[in-house]
């Protein structure tokens, strides 16, 4: 029996039937959500497996020496990943050196110093930068930043920093305007809104009472930021920085426009060079055989690097609420 009749003669649904129907709906909902989560994990594993299979001819031919090989020559069918890997790491590192202080400063201004009527417009403007297509950054970098680097910035760097011992070697080379340093400037602008937005949100997690107590004790804004906000949010800040690093590691189009795509080791950061993503973008269309496998092996290296960086960032951001 699925229904009963009350004293007024109205049909009342059986509670057991309703309970069974709800359980079936919950079960279906659980299976759908489980399937969605499983699909995401399966796609991630599938990408990793496909990259590993396609990259296997490269590692079976060159072994692990592919990772530190310095020659990339399609005519000789010899390939090494080190120039592209170093170019990726160096350009990302320089971009972080530029973007992180600016991002933290902007986040401090938005959360501590900015007038209330300007806070939302400025925050929105910064977030809109994240929506600009990367190819636009590349075009602006090529037609605006490269001539500026060639005519003004690089000559000044070569005449000043280039004369210093040790570090000066990084700025001693012909300066066509394209190179790792130019790519780093473009990357720093691209990752700036990401780090700023995350840092601002992390700063907003500091309890208002903690802020007000610090100001009530006579602390200046600088002292509050240094002794209260940054220590309280340090893990979240690092997580946001790591997310920005993950974006910088995988950027393709903007870097391809301005890095120069020279597939050999360089001793100067102002010389044309290459990155993993730029190398793949420039060569993938015409590649076949071992060259194609080597490009996919570069993609596998980039996948592992990006996955590790983003996983660490998520872990650090997730721990923010515990401190």
Labelled PLM ranges:
Residues 200-204, 208, 282-323:
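C-terminal transmembrane helix and the adjacent membrane-cytosol boundary/short C-terminal tail
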Residues 255-303:
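Interhelical loop and adjacent transmembrane-helix boundary motif
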Residues 12-32, 51-95, 115-116, 173, ...:
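Periplasmic/extracellular loop-to-transmembrane helix junction in inner-membrane transport proteins
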Residues 124, 128, 132, 136, ...:
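Transmembrane alpha-helices
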Residues 95-126, 147, 313-319:
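Transmembrane-helix boundary motif in ABC transporter permease subunits
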């Amino acid at each position: 029996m699925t229904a009963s009749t009350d004293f007024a003669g109205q049909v009342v649904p059986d509670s057991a039937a309703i309970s069974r129907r709800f359980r079936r709906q919950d079960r279906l909902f659980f299976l759908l959500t489980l399937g969605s989560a499983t699909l995401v994990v399966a796609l991630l594993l599938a990408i990793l497996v496909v990259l590993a299979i396609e990259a296997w001819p490269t590692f079976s031919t060159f072994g692990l020496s592919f990772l530190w090989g310095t020659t990339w020559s399609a005519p000789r069918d010899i390939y090494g990943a080190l120039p592209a890997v170093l170019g990726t790491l160096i350009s990302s590192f320089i971009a972080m050196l530029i973007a992180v202080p600016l991002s933290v400063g902007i986040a401090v201004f938005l959360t501590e110093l900015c007038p209330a009527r300007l806070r939302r417009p400025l925050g929105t403007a910064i977030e809109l930068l994240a929506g600009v297509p990367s190819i636009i950054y590349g075009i602006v970098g090529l037609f605006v930043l490269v001539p500026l680097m060639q005519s003004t910035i690089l000559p000044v760097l070569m005449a000043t920093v280039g004369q210093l011992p040790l570090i000066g070697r990084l700025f001693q080379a012909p300066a066509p305007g394209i190179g790792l340093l130019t790519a780093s400037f473009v990357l720093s602008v691209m990752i700036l809104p990401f780090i700023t937005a995350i840092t601002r949100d992390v700063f907003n997690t500091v309890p208002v009472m903690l802020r007000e107590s610090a100001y009530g004790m006579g602390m200046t804004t600088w002292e509050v930021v240094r002794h209260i906000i940054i220590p309280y949010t340090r893990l979240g800040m690092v997580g946001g920085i790591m997310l920005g690093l993950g974006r910088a590691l995988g950027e393709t189009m903007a870097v391809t426009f301005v890095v120069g795509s020279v597939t050999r080791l360089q001793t100067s950061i102002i010389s044309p060079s290459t990155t993993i993503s730029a190398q793949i973008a420039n060569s993938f269309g015409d590649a076949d055989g071992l060259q194609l496998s080597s490009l996919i092996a570069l993609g596998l290296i980039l996948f592992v690097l990006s996955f590790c960086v983003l996983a660490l960032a998520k872990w650090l951001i997730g721990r923010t609420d515990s401190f």
